[in-house]
């Protein structure tokens, strides 16, 4: 899963990508191809 500061490019990478909000974070999920998962925020140290 990618950790990105902006999800605009992540949601346009595949037609099936959708933006969802879970646990106060914004995720991009793709049920047909799991390579396109992403989350918005900072990386953990």
UniProtKB/Swiss-Prot annotation:
GO cellular component: ribonucleoprotein complex; ribosome
Keywords, alphabetical: Ribonucleoprotein, Ribosomal protein
Keyword Metal-binding appears in the UniProt entry: no
Transmembrane segment boundaries: none
Gene that encodes it: rpmJ
Similarity comment: Belongs to the bacterial ribosomal protein bL36 family.
Any GO molecular function: structural constituent of ribosome
The UniProt record lists the keyword Nuclease: no
Protein name: Large ribosomal subunit protein bL36
Cysteine disulfide partners in this protein: none
Domain of life: Bacteria
Example GO BP: translation
Pfam family, one: Ribosomal_L36
Record-linked SUPFAM superfamilies: Ribosomal protein L36
């Amino acid at each position: 899963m990618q950790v990105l500061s902006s999800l605009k490019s992540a949601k346009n990478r595949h037609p099936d990508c959708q933006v969802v909000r879970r646990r106060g974070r914004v995720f991009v999920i793709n049920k047909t191809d799991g390579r396109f998962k992403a989350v918005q925020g900072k990386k953990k140290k």
